[in-house]
Each structure stands twice: as C-alpha cells, then as structure tokens.
Design a protein with these regions (language model features):
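Catalytic-core elements of nucleic-acid end-processing and repair enzymes
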Residues: 1-311
Length: 311
C-alpha cells in the first residue's frame, strides 16, 4: 500500500505495531521509526548496491566518507567551534553533527511515527522537498538489551572512532589497535572501562562490530522535538563498514552486525502526495520549523505559504 494521507500512515502503523506484532504485549522489545525521503543507497565504485532491508548510516553512503571520517569531524569542529561549546562528550558532539547533516556513524530515528512521516515527505533542512521519489518509513524493533545509555562504554567507543586512523582499528585481530582508541577516550573520560580487565577489552572488540541503539542527550531542539533515538554503527577491521542486514533472520543471530535490531516492515508514501501530507502534519503540530528552529530554516518554511504563485 502506498500511503496518500496521514490517516493511511497511522492506519499502517497501527496494523504493523498492534495487529501484526502485538507491540503493547511484548515488553522485551521497543519499536521506533526512521523516515527517508527516498531509498538511500550505498555507493561502491560508482555503483548502487541493493539494500533489501538494510540501510546505511550517512557515513556509509559513499566510499569517500569512510576514508575522510576524521576530516569530517575535525573540519566541522574547526569551522564552527561555538556550536559545540555546550557539548561535554564526543557522543553529544556527534549527535549535534548528525543534526547538521555532517556524515557520522550515527543514524537518527524517532519514537513518533508522525515525525518520521515528516522526514519521509522531505521535511529536511534548506527547503529540500523531494517530490519525485516515494518516501519510506522504516519500522524498526530492538531488543531492550541492545538499547544502551549514551554513557555506555560501547557507545562512547563508537563515538571516538573518528579520532583514530583506519589502519589502527582491527577488532577481529590479535593486534586490535584498540589501545589507540582507549588513548583518545581516556583523554575525555578517565577510567574508561576498557582498562579494567582483558575480558572487558575482549567484549568491546566483539561489541564494536555491531550496530547499537541508544537514547541521546536532548542537546538540540531537533532531538527534543523529534523524540530522537540513534543507531550507532561500529566497524570491522580497518574501519570497514558493517553492512548490517537488519533482517528478521539476523535478529536472533549474535554474530550478525544487526543482532537484536531488525526492520519489521516499511510504510511507503506516494511521491505526489507528499505535499498534502506535510500540510496535514502541520495540524498535528509536526512541521519542519519546529524541528529546525534556526531562523533561516523557519524563513524557508513559512515564505512559500504566503507566495501568490504557490499552488
């Protein structure tokens, strides 16, 4: 079914969550949503790779992004240091960078299906409304033990990966290189648990090769209004992407990168109905100017409403 209005979207969400998956009865998992204005594809050697149920974090949408992960972080910080003055941790910094669309290992989602619908209808920054492609709301479930605190060791470790060269991270090898990562982390967080015992270090080597969900600090208006939750993507040797499937088959496979996190279904939005749905969402208190409260974004959102030739 291709949704044509907000009611269609809510009906589909109700069917998926409560009729098919009995979400209110299963206390072992949580459900959330990710809205995409089109089907984002991975790029390898100039070719699009099939996604099936998988979806990449922004950093994995282009080969060059992975190669220059450290540059992205350093340049974003150098060019706009004032924006990060209130951030006390790397997790908070990367969350803010994700907000401003800097490619990171974080992938944002929401517990609010209407907010996901806004993003699926192209409600991003800078007036970028995509009316040519169908939108998608990915319905995702995660085991509660795979949802971490923003202060947990594994989330902190993944957040510090941009500071370490690719060649120095090899979690599957004896010379795993995690001492480089530990050095960067302890600069910001003395007493990081990786130093506690070889067993904890071994566990981190395993965990860093998975995707994890975590609930971030609400340090931006977007994250607060979005009811945001993040997926944090770890890495393989040489910081190669994980390519998680997010399939139901891998949901219970501890060796799978997406263990404990799966896409259960996709709600599809008809491309030529996006404008109507955005207008309907405004009556439910969901609009871009609430999520992106910068004056430039607010201006770009409200100006077309009062233009005579806007039809």
């Amino acid at each position: 079914m291709r949704c044509k209005c907000v009611r269609d979207i809510v009906d589909e969400a109700n069917r998926i969550l409560f009729t098919k998956h009995h979400a209110t009865e299963d206390r072992s998992v949580e459900y959330f949503f990710r809205g995409e204005s089109k089907n984002f594809l991975r790029q390898r050697d100039g070719m699009n790779l099939p996604l099936d149920t998988s979806f990449p974090c922004c950093l994995d949408r282009d080969d060059g992004y992975i190669d220059h992960e450290r540059d992205f972080y350093q340049e974003a910080l150098r060019l706009n240091i004032a924006s990060f003055e209130k951030d006390q941790t790397m997790v908070e910094r990367l969350g803010r960078m994700q907000h401003y669309q800097v490619p990171t290992r974080f992938c944002d989602a929401t517990t609010n299906v209407l907010m996901a619908a806004m993003f699926a209808c192209g409600g991003g920054r800078h007036g970028e409304y995509d009316e040519e492609h169908d939108g998608y709301i990915r319905v995702i479930k995660a085991k509660k033990e795979r949802i971490k605190s923003f202060t947990s060791d594994i989330i902190v470790a993944i957040a510090h990966l941009p500071l370490v060269d690719r060649k120095n991270i090899n979690p599957s090898k004896k010379d795993d290189g995690l001492d480089y990562l530990r050095y960067e982390i302890t600069n910001n967080r003395p007493g990081f648990a990786m130093t506690a015992s070889p067993e904890i270090k071994r566990k981190l080597c395993e965990e860093i090769q998975h995707v994890w969900a975590f609930k971030p600090v609400w340090n931006t208006e977007r994250i607060r209004e979005q009811s945001g939750i993040f997926l944090a993507f770890g890495c393989r040797d040489n910081k190669e992407p994980l390519h998680p499937t997010f399939s139901l088959q891998d949901f219970n496979n501890p060796d799978a990168p997406s263990y404990g996190i799966a896409q259960v279904e996709v709600i599809q939005i008809q491309s030529d109905c996006k404008s109507r749905i955005r207008e309907e969402l405004r009556y439910f208190g969901v609009s871009r100017e609430l999520v992106y409260s910068d004056l430039s974004d607010v201006a770009q959102e409200i100006t077309p409403r009062y233009t005579y030739n806007n039809k």
